[in-house]
Amino acid sequence: MAVSEQTVARAASLRDELNLYNHHYYTLDAPLVSDAQYDSLLNELRAIEAEYPELRTPDSPTQRVGSAPLSKFPKVQHPVPMLSLGNAFNADDLAAWRRRAEQIIGTQPMSYTVEPKIDGLAVALTYINGVFSVGATRGNGEIGEDITANLRTIRDVPLRLQPIDGQALPERIEVRGEVYLPIESFNQLNERQAHAGEKVFANPRNAAAGSLRQLDSTITASRPLRFFAYAVGPFSGVELKSQAQTLDTLRTYGFSVNPDTRLFADFEAVIEYCHEWMSRRESLSYEVDGVVVKINDFAMQRELGVVGRDPRWAIAYKFPAREETTTLLNIVINVGRTGKLIPNAVLEPVSLGGTTVQHASLHNADYIISRDIRIGDRVVVKRAGDVIPYVIGPIVEARTGDERVWPAPTHCPTCGQPVEQIGDEVDIYCVNNTCPARLIRSIEHWVSRGAMDIVGMGERQASQFVEMGLIKSIPDIYRLTVDSFGGREGYGERRVANLLNAIEESKRRPLDRVITALGINGVGTVAAADLARYFRSLPALAQATIEQLTAIEGIGGSTAQSVVDFFNTPANQQLIAELLALGLKAEPSEVAELQSDRLAGKSFVITGTLPGISREAAQALIEAHGGKVGGSVSKKTDYLLAGEAAGSKLTKAQSLGVKVLSMDELHALLVDE
């Protein structure tokens, strides 16, 4: 059947339009149309190409869905080897690298690019007259594998380059970069894999590599891989003189280029930026294992050349490892204050992130079983920032046959009572309210600094007092007297007096601290402050309805239900009655007089370590000027006040377009104009 000129023109128009929308959505993060509009146009193009296959072009957006499975990947010879990089681990190593370069090219002025080193899979993409032709893995640097069909499925790999100001596209250009899987996408993928009973991936890099090397490209298409371009290989028909110019050109062609790349003329600034990345890495939405420093000028790069397989003009500044392998020696169970049984790994000591790690989290029994983690396994352990180290999974290939399957507990290891799984939760609970382990954890929480702040009572004292029989419930803390400690070793007159004074002082803690101390599920310090401001007393809060609770900004349905359930439990009603009878005041904090209304109507969330000020003090400052501080980032959040190691809240704020402030910028908002 002959194809009309109108149909040919419509197919071409749809291709151009959809490629433009892809570029704005995936590369610029600035969608031009809704998902429904995009899908409608894509379906129209699919229908045309199904009826007229001759109109299906290599750069068509319909080609991103994957093609027929392959039996194996063909080999590809890289025309110019994909080199490895030498490593630097500190400022001295960076300075030594620079001196070696100066010995060859002299002490002439140099500029440097500094780029995040994405922890993914290096690939090379060849474009002929602007059209994506061949894509290959790095392989051994000289020979890789042809994974063109899989690379076509990645949304921010352009299938056709965008011309620059009417200039002709290069006749041939090889673009090099990194395929990676964002952390959130990695976690979602592993959840799906575990739910389906399939192998979970140890880390985002392995997931990206495994996804790219699928013989069936429809599997690759189902996984949200991303791509950052960072270099070119051989090229013709375009003039490129520096790394910075190359990145700008690639960005204009339609590639995603890491926005955190910087150009410096001062080498000290290079070192400072490398150090800055040591703290920033935790706030990223993707994994990095260092930064790459390159001498910017291509003429200098050619003069410096290569030694072995490493270019003299570039070096990788490597961060301390966040993942290591070690042996799982045992699995022990801790019991939390809610009765949750928490499995913990006992490990052969391993250095991780600058510290020696011997224990790590295993989350819950379902996590261990779904990943088939066995005692004696070689396991991958990860530590990120201040997060407790945790076991990612076993290295199955390293098994010897001596490993032991872990038996999930059926009874509490402390009190011996049968355990239960509540509702749809994956966690296992000890439901014995008199379990000593639960009581000890509850005491620790009650006396903690963010709650009742009883100086002289901590983890060790809580365990001792329970073992001595002095404390059998939280109210027993307020029944302690001098006679309770009579003759007990380590508790002299002065120490006992100080402890009893601290306990007496805690009776005057404000209502929000008492609510925090009660340990209601989902109620942290911010929610506790909101509840205290609204209800003004424990009896009033105890009578609150779901409707009243959810009317408070920041209190969601699940938290409201937790509050109602807590106060409807007879044991908790008795707890509160006893505490009030023992003299607990639980009165609301005095509302500080407003210093100004400059932040009135503005909502803030605070995250990270702030310079020179605690989060509590920052919250008080914001509230003193009429602002409100919440606990989680949402579309309603006006500002995120972020310090160092800001973490996932910063990532979410950036994705929602929430303005991020430093302390200096917050102070600027408060200055008189």
UniProtKB/Swiss-Prot annotation:
Function per UniProt: DNA ligase that catalyzes the formation of phosphodiester linkages between 5'-phosphoryl and 3'-hydroxyl groups in double-stranded DNA using NAD as a coenzyme and as the energy source for the reaction. It is essential for DNA replication and repair of damaged DNA.
SUPFAM superfamilies per UniProt: BRCT domain, DNA ligase/mRNA capping enzyme, catalytic domain, Nucleic acid-binding proteins, RuvA domain 2-like
Active site residues per record: 117 (n6-amp-lysine intermediate)
Gene: ligA
Stretches assigned to the BRCT domain: 594-673
Sequence positions that bind Zn(2+): 412, 415, 430, 435
GO MF entry, a single one: DNA ligase (NAD+) activity
Claim: NAD is one of the keywords in the record: yes
Designated name of the protein: DNA ligase
Catalytic activity: NAD(+) + (deoxyribonucleotide)n-3'-hydroxyl + 5'-phospho-(deoxyribonucleotide)m = (deoxyribonucleotide)n+m + AMP + beta-nicotinamide D-nucleotide
Entry's EC annotation: 6.5.1.2
Gene Ontology annotations of biological process type: DNA repair; DNA replication
Organism of derivation: Herpetosiphon aurantiacus (strain ATCC 23779 / DSM 785 / 114-95)
Family recorded in the similarity comment: Belongs to the NAD-dependent DNA ligase family. LigA subfamily.
GO CC list: cytosol
